[in-house]
Amino acid sequence: MSQNQETRGFQSEVKQLLQLMIHSLYSNKEIFLRELISNASDAADKLRFKALSNPALYEGDGDLRVRVSFDADKGTITISDNGIGMTREQVIDHLGTIAKSGTKEFLTALGQDQAKNSQLIGQFGVGFYSAFIVADKVTVKTRAAGEEADKAVLWESAGEGEYSVADIEKKSRGTDVILHLREDEKEFLNEWRLREIIGKYSDHIGLPVEMLTKEYDDEGKECGEKWEKINKSDALWTRSKNDVSDEEYKAFYKHLSHDFVDPVTWAHNKVEGNQAYTSLLYVPAKAPWDLFNREHKHGLKLYVQRVFIMDDAEQFMPNYLRFMRGLIDSNDLPLNVSREILQDNKITAALRKALTKRSLQMLEKLAKDDAEKYLKFWKEFGLVLKEGPAEDFANKETIAKLLRFASTHNDGSEQTVSLEDYILRMKEGQKAIYYITADSYVAAKNSPHLELFNKKGIEVLLLSDRIDEWMLSYLTEFDGKQLQSITKADLDLGDLADKESETQKQQDKAFGSFIERVKNLLGERVKTVRLTHNLTDTPAVVSTDNDQMTTQMAKLFAAAGQPVPEVKYTFELNPEHYLVKKVADIADETEFADWVELLLEQAMLAERGSLENPAAFIKRINKLLG
């Protein structure tokens, strides 16, 4: 029987909040249960802390738990706890106003030193109102620890701007939250649906969550019901890593990620200091199918004192590490009004920095300890890691060590060569790391620009991923060595360059008039025309200057629908090649023009993989062959 009943209006902020809740402030409805179980966990934590100095508050019942039940006929779900409970004044303050769930005031009252150990969560206390996402009426029955049974409180609201509060009798300490579900939310009146949600969100809180289960006699006949713990209530990451087996880590990864394959590696760390947190990070073995989809969700699971707050907390990991899986569990993270969107602040930034460093250390260790495993990882996630130099300047050198490339040192197209490997094999006097970018490994491997390097035995990295050119615009040096494209017209081999011979000087002089004829013929279509002594088997190539956009970068711009600046090539001719010698001797201007055009088109085709007018090219070949 209720007494001393009164009806009150919600604080104006609460009215706004309820409207947001009812219209799905949260991204999915089922988290109402997570929030209410989280509140029950709060209540248990508060009781544990206060009972340290006043054990009588346990009232002979120190086995704290939360119980979830439902009544399909009445259309209700009840979440009950035997935690700290609330007085009438606390109910009015905490359920009638926003940002006063009690946790923040509780911490202030205790003082910061004690609060460090209190394991309390939340700053805003809006989780309770999430009940109105699925309920058109909410009833709360609560009695504060240490109060008489007739000092309990009844609170009810339909979420429409006001609530009622009255005195009732309640024998047991704690709080019962009864949700009267909307007609279209009856899917939650199902034991297995509730078990699924509890397993998903509350498996690893440090409080048993119980549901009623049927009991059967020896003959298999139903003989009653009993409360059964349905969550693990054992946060694996809070245990010492020395007490967790590899199999447990692997099983937890699969539980966490819903992956069927064992992870490649993992790291479990507990950090204390200005920020106290625990992280458990995993490197998956296989890339998800939508890894490069912009809508792909990624990030870590966020827990606050073992209470699951959100999936895909991307604030803690840079985009180029979006393949990392795992969790972070912290007690002092600030949360916004919905507890699903982290505030952008110094704590978040510091955690991101630390977790990024930890992830890169994991990959460094894997590469060092098990090269074969690392190469398997690279095949799955290498393209993503190549985004790193552009995104993370502070860790650029570390990321660069993790990159792998195909190379002229090896026969196959597999990307197995690190920049450190390359430097160890550099020629005496070599000052740069040389590379070439192309549309494919085959195109890079057979580029005429490689001829001189093959002749001198200088290793060249063969880059054919679309992202490579963009990556190299940010990764310009490593370990004090410049990364240099061999397709540049102003390529400088330094001490490795051949000294100009007397023969070359004579050739330059003899072909002077020929070069002028070609310049006059091509005019503004090329930047310049010159002889080159860097080719062995090819008559001509085109190249760009260092200050010009490369061919591959221009292709990236075009593929992205961006305007592409005009690229004017330097046309380089090999005076040792019989075709160039033949063309130089042609007197007829028409025939001369056809042959020069053919040499230019061949060079352009080798460089770009396509021509603006392939029909004219074919026609010219047929004409000269006829």
Curated annotation (Swiss-Prot):
Region entry C, spans: 556-626
Gene3D superfamilies referenced in this protein's UniProt entry, alphabetically: 3.30.230.80, 3.40.50.11260, Heat shock protein 90, C-terminal domain, Histidine kinase-like ATPase, C-terminal domain
Chain segments carrying region A: 1-339
GO molecular function: ATP binding; ATP hydrolysis activity; ATP-dependent protein folding chaperone; unfolded protein binding
Pfam families for the chain: HATPase_c_3 (PF13589), HSP90 (PF00183)
UniProt entry keywords in alphabetical sequence: ATP-binding, Chaperone, Cytoplasm, Nucleotide-binding, Stress response
This protein's record includes keyword Nucleus: no
B: annotated span: 340-555
Gene Ontology annotations for the cellular component aspect, listed alphabetically: cytoplasm
Predominant location: cytoplasm
Location(s), subcellular: Cytoplasm
InterPro entries: HATPase_C_sf, Heat_shock_protein_90_CS, HSP90_C, Hsp90_fam, Hsp90_N, Ribosomal_Su5_D2-typ_SF
Function in brief: Molecular chaperone. Has ATPase activity.
Subunit (UniProt): Homodimer.
Homology family: Belongs to the heat shock protein 90 family.
Protein name per its UniProtKB record: Chaperone protein HtpG
Organism: Haemophilus influenzae (strain 86-028NP)
